[in-house]
Amino acid sequence: MSDIMTPIPFDRLMNRILVEHQQGAVFGMQKCYQAKNLQPNTLFGRKLEGQIGPAAGPNTQLAQNIVASYYGGARFFELKTVQKMDGRELAACVAKPCITAEDECYNCEWSTELEVPQAFAEYVKGWFACKVMAKEYDLGDPDAFQFNISVGYDLEGIKLPKVDRFINEMKDAKDTEIFKECKAWLLANLDRFQKVTKEDVEAIQSEIINSVTVSTLHGCPPSEIEAIASYLIQEKHLHTFVKCNPTLLGYETARAILDEMGYDYIAFTDFHFKDDLQYSDAVPMLKRLQELAKSLNLAFGVKITNTFPVDVKNNELPSQEMYMSGKSLFALSMSVAKMLTRDFNGSLRISFSGGADYFNIERIVEAGIWPVTMATTLLKTGGYLRFIQMAELLEKNLAKPWEKVELSLVEKMIADAKSDKHLVKPVKPLPNRKSDKKVPLVDCYTMPCRDRCPIHQDITSYGRLVNEGKFQEALEVILDKNPLPFMTGNICTHTCQSACTRNHYETDVQIRTNKLIAARGGYDAVLPGLKQEGSVQKKVGVIGAGPAGISAAFFLARAGVEVHVYDKDAVAGGVVANVIPGFRIPAEEIQKDVNLAKQYGAQFHLGQEVSDIDAFRKENNFDAVVVAIGAHKEAPLVLEKGEAYNALHFLADFKAQDGKVNLGKNVVVVGAGNTAMDVARAAKRNAGVENVYLVYRRTKRYMPADQEELEEAIEEGVNFQELLAPFTHENSKLLCHRMVLSDVDASGRRSVKESDEVVEIPCDTVIASIGEKVDGSFYEKNGIAVTDKGLPVLKKESNETSVAGVYAAGDGAFGASVIVKAIADAKLACEAILNKTIGTDRPSQTTDEKIYGKKGNLVEPEKGLNPDKRCLACDHICENCCDVCPNRANFAIKVPGVEMHQIIHVDYMCNECGNCETFCPYDSAPYKEKFTLFHRAEEMEDSTNDGFAFVDNDGNAIVRVGGEKMNYKVGDKNTKLFYRLAELVDTVYNDYSYLLI
């Protein structure tokens, strides 16, 4: 495929807007912002009914980007930068993909990739389209939005004829061909409008802009910056912003801010800080420009800030340097604003861009900093729809005139940013949220949470029922696949939440909370009604009453099998009941999970240890045996002197002795997994303990514990000692070698090297939490084949061991893991025993309107045990790739007779930025892998995408699938083309012909 975009002619642009709006959307946006009965503000002598809009960048390059922004609520548009290098010459210099915005954003793009005259035409088309949309769709005052041009990068280039002409024609476009064309089309097609009149069209002003933002390259001398701004003020009579760089802060300050906020991994040197404009030169220059503009009755200010150049270290983008933006830039940008506000006493106008979004936009504007433009937040799921929420939020202060920038408010924002979870980097690296599957050509909607769950729970279904207050029904849905709703509702590691699409908004849906609400709210009603599904003439013994054993008992007993569960402990529940502290999960709720299995008829024989499987099986006439013995073999911590207390032994003692274990005052926990966090938190609660230290050979970022577990330990006062490796415990001290981080290893973690430095930590008791192993001797004694790690050799499809009829599940089968994995193991074994599939997939049963109503809205979950209603029901509508495409090149269509929307890629609108690849839940890049509509058949030659192009107006098309081309006629029932793909081609031709330009 080619990265050269084809602009949409104005007649086709307007036709699409009008026809698609009748279908309920505009450029894929199913809702809009309407500025009703608002008193607008003023900026540069013109009305402005909103202080926000898209920044110069991927969201202001094409007419459709501008239209989508306006429809969403943008009212100030900083158009993509124009400079002397343009078109194919510039595109050849931009490495693709050029954007990655999963968390903070990085890009390696520059100015417009269009030719300058094309860019001008796009801006004029966008201008006209927004004007008539405002009137036709009641979006607001047609004269209350503003365009602002961005030009660069040197005075010589700005004075070149093509850029000079661009500036002049943006100032007054009435004599240009594109302006005349747009106006003529509107006048000739007034019959297609309900509200737009001839007078409205005639009133569209040709003075598109009266302001400019100066953009210069890094290293541009202050004299050149001043010369450019002076020229635009004096010669072009434009209100002017000069874009400033975060490098004004100085290297040490910028490095310290980023390190403090968790961005210590972002690499950069002091080169740009020395090479860029220096603050000591900036202030006098800006004061001179401010006075110059004032003398000509023009406004002057700064644009804070440009993106921040950093090094490519982990193949983030195919370039050597990339430009950082988004949340990691906020504190840097606002710190520049603070310095300038202080030194100008608030009189210097600031246009802001640098990590603005819904969570901070109100405070930014209240501080007197506006207009505010943005890019990163628009590149995430929800896309342009995110403008709606922000525009509504700002309505109440819209009319407040600008007086000055309030220094105290700016300082408060900076201070708060250092601990704002929306701005700081999480302690742990982001999990991989992508599936290992490739995106299919059709039916690609998917539910990442269910896909990631080992038992594929119907999360959206029970979540919906919980929010409807139908707890009994919700629990019934859960129990279909999950026999341990209380255990998983309390302490599941919820990998489902890590994959949740809402992570790209703010915080994952609290799936585990919804489950616990259903369990607690539905248990009493559900329990008496649990009846066996039938009678299966089988008898099965289960060894072990932990999560895997209870799960096996539940599944088998429900099916009608006679099940007997044996365990050496007096209390069923395994490690969960006998080891995990009570502050993690109430004991009575563990037993409720046991009761569910008992209600189906499972019989528990506690305090009875089984050592001989063959005898056990014969004595009880068991048709099958499920071994679920857990992983309890210690992984000892070897010290030169002293001994360590085993983590599981301590937790069991802590529970049995009611938190009164003799530990002394100072406790050191060695390890960094979830169990280590439990140990540390339990030790903090233990009688007599004053200090708890957690020692690990790497840093918090590389600790295996889940983010949630880590944060809870930090909040409870556990003292984390990073980069330490213990070697001796004596005289109430633990001696550790200081470790030094080295390069990233194959696991994705940075390797460590031991230094000569020795660190002493006060220590009365050392508790080792460095993992548990499976005791392979149990299997060997029973004639079961094991691996070199002591794990049983199992059949992948059934978890059956080398002994026929004997199955293994849980930690004892695969090593220490999590509860939901134990359930999955047990389920697989039970399916083999029963010879049937357990559980039924249930759709979310929601509506398009409900889902689209949530898209674009950033909302944190309620605190406490409250239902989380923010689910986007991705099994019904995903469309992430459509949301995040700035150019709207991924599009959802409704195929007649097909329930779910289908996604096609539109080649002529794509510049291969790669943003959709980041947010697609599959291990795929939609712009390369979805069925693609090409502008012309010859453009298929520049691409390897499967797709189609129409060759005439009669429905004849060329289609390529799997590299093979064929001719296809719309409606042909005898075609060899797969019917689902034929439906896509037919639907585009019949119902979405506005996509054909």
Where are these regions (language model features)?
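A conserved FAD-binding loop/helix module that cradles the flavin
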Residues: G812-T837
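FAD-site-proximal beta/loop scaffold in flavoenzymes
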Residues: G642-G664, V744-A816
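Glycine-rich phosphate-binding active-site loops on the catalytic face of alpha/beta enzymes
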Residues: R75-M85, P246, R363-M390
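Beta1-alpha1 glycine-rich phosphate/pyrophosphate-binding loop at the start
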Residues: Q457-N467, L475, H504, D508, ...
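Iron-sulfur cluster-binding cysteine motifs and their immediate structural context
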Residues: M447-E468, G489-A519, H564, V571, ...
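Glycine-rich dinucleotide-binding loop and its adjacent helix/turn
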Residues: A518-G534, K592-I613, E634-N686, T787-S798, ...
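C-terminal helical cap(s) of enzyme catalytic domains, especially alpha/beta-barrels
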Residues: R88-E104, L379-E403
